[in-house]
Regions:
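Membrane-embedded transmembrane alpha-helical bundles that form the catalytic cores
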Residues: 1-281, 290-327
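Substrate/cofactor-recognition hotspot
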Residues: 286
Length: 328
């Protein structure tokens, strides 16, 4: 097994991947080394500057006694867990892709800016792309073909079968099964609402449509991730109960105090969270440009030094955990 390509992805067809390995040994080139190092540093910043800092607050909220949390606390925890998961997993992929690039081996991209998705189906076309392609080829299409004469049944069973396997892929617990069932529900509703959604998209300007449906998609994914993150069904339903407890929506502080001082926690934790949130939002705004820059050789020495300084100064290494998707 090539060391940069682990079970968490990117997942390749053996025939296409083997063609690259046939040409070994690889000649090291300035471009491959430069782009590879930049990609590794980008992935390390995602993991150790953003994901690890977000994890401190996210873990605190998910592992906190739910009866003292407000709905706003739970809402932010769910959203930022989704952000943490993305930066953690895409950071791992960046490191894997960059490590392979050092030796001239091209691994497939596994993400295409999923937090810009305007629907759940688009989310899954942008998230863990190599795994979804594998599921589509070997599970979705065969089931859909089996029911090709009955379109509605084909949609229901192909989506249901795909996400049943996906749930088992991640774990055998009920929480993963419910996570999969929620996405089955999302995708079936979307599939049967295509005409209505297309009509809405035609009436709205593209930017307005994106401004409306990107947040909706993130909220829907974040809700499903309650089951993905919770350690038990009891915890998951406890979080959901607090999420919809409208009598305690805001924290027991004024919004200004809550925004500045937070609710409990040390000053170090509050700084970690705000710094991580700022870097995450900044990156997501300029994500497309950042990905182009790290694949550019021009002025690379300045970018490498800059990213290395960010990693050394702001990285969290002493309490860093494993990459989340290494657990699956």
């Amino acid at each position: 097994m090539f060391f940069a390509r682990l079970a968490s992805g990117p997942i390749h067809n053996i025939n296409s991947f083997q063609k690259q390995l046939v040409n070994l040994p690889i000649k090291l080139t300035e471009e491959n080394i430069t782009v590879g190092i930049q990609r590794i540093l980008l992935g390390s910043i995602k993991k150790f500057v953003v994901a690890e800092r977000l994890a401190v607050d996210v873990n605190q909220y998910f592992d906190h006694p739910f009866d003292i949390l407000s709905s706003c606390d739970v809402l932010f925890a769910c959203i930022f867990y989704t952000v943490e998961l993305y930066f953690d997993f895409s950071g791992y992929i960046d490191i894997a892709v960059g490590s392979a690039k050092l030796f001239g081996i091209q691994l497939s991209e596994n993400f295409n800016m999923p937090l810009r998705a305007k629907s759940i189906s688009e989310w899954w076309r942008r998230w863990h792309i190599t795994l979804i392609n594998w599921f589509t080829q070997y599970i979705y299409y065969p089931i859909a073909y089996r029911f090709k004469s009955k379109r509605n049944l084909a949609i229901v069973f192909s989506i249901g079968g795909t996400f049943l396997v996906s749930a088992v892929w991640h774990g055998l617990g009920l929480t993963y099964l419910f996570w999969g069932l929620i996405h089955v529900f999302y995708l079936i509703v979307e599939a049967f609402s295509k005409k209505n959604l297309a009509a809405i998209e035609q009436k709205l300007k593209p930017r307005l449509y994106a401004a409306l449906f990107i947040p909706i998609t993130i909220l829907l994914v974040s809700f499903s991730n309650i089951f993905f993150r919770a350690s038990s069904m009891t915890d998951a339903f406890g979080i959901i109960h607090k999420l919809f407890d409208w009598n305690h929506f805001w924290p027991p502080l004024s919004f200004k105090d809550w925004l500045i001082h937070g609710e409990g926690g040390s000053l170090k934790d509050l700084f970690n969270f705000r710094l991580a949130a700022f870097v995450a939002i900044l990156y997501l705004i300029y994500e497309e440009k950042c990905l182009k820059i790290v694949n550019d050789v021009k002025y690379s020495i300045f970018r490498i030094v800059f990213m290395l300084l960010i990693l050394i100064i702001l990285g969290v290494f002493d309490s860093a955990g494993n990459f989340i998707y290494m657990e699956f």
